[in-house]
Amino acid sequence: MLRSAVRLAGKDVRFGEDARRSMQKGVTRAVAAVATTLGPKGRNVII
């Protein structure tokens, strides 16, 4: 049986402006990853 080693990050709770900036940074990265993999018809997304 194959076992994959997965390390999960600890919880990082943020509030206010710091939370908004962190969320925006993650959304921007996701948009950049999806935008480059949409393909000719826009049906395929690989992240």
UniProtKB/Swiss-Prot annotation:
GO cellular component entries: mitochondrial matrix
Record's note on what induces expression: By heat shock.
Location(s) in or outside the cell: Mitochondrion matrix
Gene Ontology molecular function: any one: ATP binding
Keywords annotated in UniProt: ATP-binding, Chaperone, Mitochondrion, Nucleotide-binding, Stress response, Transit peptide
The organelle targeting sequence, given as a residue range: 1-8
SUPFAM superfamilies listed in its UniProt record: GroEL equatorial domain-like
Main location class: mitochondrion
Alphabetical list of InterPro entries matching this protein: GROEL-like_equatorial_sf (IPR027413)
Summary of the function given for this chain in its UniProt record: Implicated in mitochondrial protein import and macromolecular assembly. May facilitate the correct folding of imported proteins. May also prevent misfolding and promote the refolding and proper assembly of unfolded polypeptides generated under stress conditions in the mitochondrial matrix.
Family indicated by similarity: Belongs to the chaperonin (HSP60) family.
Protein name (database record): Chaperonin HSP60, mitochondrial
Organism in which the protein naturally occurs: Leishmania tarentolae
